Amino acid sequence: TKLNNTDTIECNIKYDNSESCIRKYNILRESLKNHKMKNMEYRISLLKKLLELWDKYENLVNKSNLLHLGQSEVISSMYSYAIIRKEITYAISNLNKWVKPIKCDTPLFIGYADSYVIPEPFGLTLIFSAWNCNFLNLFVPLIQAIAAGNLCLWKPASMSPETCKVCLMILNEMPGDVVQSCAGKRLFLEGISLP
């Protein structure tokens, strides 16, 4: 379909206040306790779901880039869509290698033993999106955080409402105990003050 920059994207954004942002943060903190993000197969299934959603919303990604940045469909497909799609497929294909224990030297004072570095999730990540390249600033850290086994709280840029709408449409189809978003104009300080 031919895109023009006079349309808008139909989506009702529900802006959060600081209480709902804290509630979403607490949902993610509670879901940390079940340790399901330590399961590599679960992480791969989340990345595959994200890839499926990314493909599903390709036209809206291109349309929002046209409306917000004035990018043509070709440029948007090459930069926003293709880069993020490649990032997801790269994470899926390499996750097995990334989670393997890494053998390392054992200190002499420990004696005869084998030592390994075992990759573990850190827990909860907070992602802020910039107004000028919202898709890359959201999805690249999101993909890496999910691959690492972390949960994500996302604060979209309020200066790019069309892009924010598409991102919210995609993230709302992801499991709510893995990804949450706090959309609002003055939630920056609330986001960085969370424990």
Each language-model region and where it sits:
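Rossmann-like NAD(P) dinucleotide-binding subdomain of oxidoreductase/dehydrogenase enzymes
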Residues: 106-195
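N-terminal Rossmann-like NAD(P)+-binding subdomain of aldehyde/semialdehyde dehydrogenases
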Residues: 1-116
